[in-house]
Amino acid sequence: MSVAAPGLARAENGATLDVRRGMEATFAVTIADGRIALGPPRISRLGTAQPNDGEITVGVEPGGMTPYAKLRVTEKSAAPIDFMATGFIDRIEIDEIALCGRLDRPVTERIAAGSWRVSLNRFAVGTGVDTCK
């Protein structure tokens, strides 16, 4: 994930959201006064939600017989939002990846399929390219 330069927005209070396998979370993202504020998530079954303007949807597709699950991210926010996704089994961290925000197309990345839940955290305004890692 890219290190934010002074003046770039960061999420307030280390905001995090959790998503479980086979589910997706849709949440509002507001950028104001140099801060990113996250709205409460709407949890739904995978593939049933689309973000409205100002929202992001993140879904976790189980990996089946592969060692990786797929994270699907669709953004309709005012600016691309980069964030980290951390996979957990109970309280044990097993994987962590950076997701680069894109407004022009959905993003799909891999995370360990054994993750019972995925914590979305360290939100920051991105550049809209695949180089936030």
Where are these regions (language model features)?
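Asparagine-centered strand-capping/turn motif at beta-strand->loop junctions
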Residues: 71-79
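Short, hydrophobic beta-strand segments
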Residues: 109-114
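Membrane engagement elements in two modes
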Residues: 1-68, 115-133
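Coil-to-beta-strand transition motifs
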Residues: 66, 78-81
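Short acidic, flexible loop segments centered on an aromatic residue
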Residues: 81-94
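Solvent-exposed serine/threonine-rich low-complexity stretches and specific carbohydrate-binding patches
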Residues: 95-108
